[in-house]
């Protein structure tokens, strides 16, 4: 039994679709959303994405990361299969780690207009260095803007011990 009406699921076309088309080039248009039925309260939604890949824009070598996407929804939420396909579309996309995290956050803001969102990429080392870009956003003029500032200043005060991931 579902509590969702068909009208609430009109924009959700990928979930349950057996003929999924896997795109290998950056494709933000694959993202889909659905209505948040609990917009009267704040709550976090967190996605752990351990299989993210993109390409170095200079060398074309593959980069691998676990990405953490956390957000407080407002009126819309991202549909998880569309998010999976969207992240998969970075496979042949050449950009620096920092750029990829900001692109992902910007696309999700455009899709959902969340109250708050953060995207944190933990990339595996290449050349003996791992890069962990973190970006966040709080809706301007709200308490979430202050929350974003606070979390930015305190997000990695006690970093984990790097054990070659």
From Swiss-Prot:
Domain of life: Bacteria
Keywords: Cytoplasm, NADP, Oxidoreductase, Queuosine biosynthesis
A Pfam family it matches: QueF
Active-site residues, as the UniProt record annotates them: 56 (thioimide intermediate), 63 (proton donor)
One Gene Ontology molecular-function label: preQ1 synthase activity
Role of this protein: Catalyzes the NADPH-dependent reduction of 7-cyano-7-deazaguanine (preQ0) to 7-aminomethyl-7-deazaguanine (preQ1).
Protein name according to UniProt: NADPH-dependent 7-cyano-7-deazaguanine reductase
């Amino acid at each position: 039994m579902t509590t969702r009406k068909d009208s609430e699921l009109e924009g959700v076309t990928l979930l349950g679709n057996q003929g999924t088309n896997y795109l290998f080039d950056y494709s933000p248009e694959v993202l889909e959303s659905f209505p948040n039925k609990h917009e009267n309260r704040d709550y976090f939604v967190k996605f752990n994405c351990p299989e993210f890949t993109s390409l170095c824009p200079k060398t074309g070598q593959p980069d691998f990361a676990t990405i953490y996407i956390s957000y407080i929804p407002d009126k819309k939420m991202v549909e998880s299969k569309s998010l999976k396909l969207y992240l998969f579309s970075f496979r042949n996309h050449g950009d620096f780690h920092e750029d990829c995290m900001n692109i992902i956050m910007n696309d999700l803001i455009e899709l959902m207009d969340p109250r708050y969102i953060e995207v944190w990429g933990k990339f595996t080392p290449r050349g003996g260095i791992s890069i962990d870009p973190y970006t966040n956003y709080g809706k301007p003029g709200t308490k979430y803007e202050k929350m974003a500032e606070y979390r930015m200043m305190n997000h990695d005060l006690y970093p984990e011990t790097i054990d070659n991931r």
